[in-house]
């Protein structure tokens, strides 16, 4: 059966790991790759699989909403400007502590986290120990020092 993760092209090892994680996800995932490598698409497909009652069928309401960028329990956050601002970090922490709107979990996709700097430690505790209903998918071009702790887990 085809599923949403079949849409991720050229990353069979990453897809296999994400597919294996759908039934029992952990608190955070770090997807690293250069621009154009497909990390954002993989994160979206993974979010759909996590919220889908069938593990990512691609056809149900949850899958369609996630893939269309309209699911209330999936939030994609991209820092504005050259670096992650304190306000951005605060918003991420606030969103992480809110309950899901529709389902049992919510997914926060944190894009361009290679741009995190001084406020990285502020986010670290939230990313490492979110509420049980929150799954983080962290996207980065590289793994800067501030993300090493996340990468090591």
What residue ranges belong to the model's regions?
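Sensor-1/coupling segment of RecA-like P-loop NTPase cores
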Residues: 130-147
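Active-site catalytic pocket residues across diverse enzymes, especially alpha/beta-hydrolases
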Residues: 50, 127-130
């Amino acid at each position: 059966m085809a599923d949403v993760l079949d849409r991720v092209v050229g990353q069979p090892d990453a897809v296999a790991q994400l597919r294996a994680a759908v039934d029992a996800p952990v608190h955070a995932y770090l997807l690293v790759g250069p621009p154009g490598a497909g990390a954002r698409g993989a994160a979206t497909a993974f979010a759909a699989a996590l919220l889908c009652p069938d593990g990512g069928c691609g056809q149900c309401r949850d899958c369609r909403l996630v893939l269309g960028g309209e699911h209330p329990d999936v939030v994609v956050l991209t820092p504005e400007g050259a670096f992650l601002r304190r306000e951005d970090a605060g918003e991420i922490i606030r969103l992480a502590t809110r309950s899901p709107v529709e389902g049992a979990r919510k997914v926060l996709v944190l894009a361009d986290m290679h741009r995190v700097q001084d406020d990285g430690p502020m986010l670290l505790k939230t990313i490492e120990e979110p509420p049980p209903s929150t799954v983080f998918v962290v996207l980065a071009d590289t793994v800067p020092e501030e993300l090493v702790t996340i990468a090591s887990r």
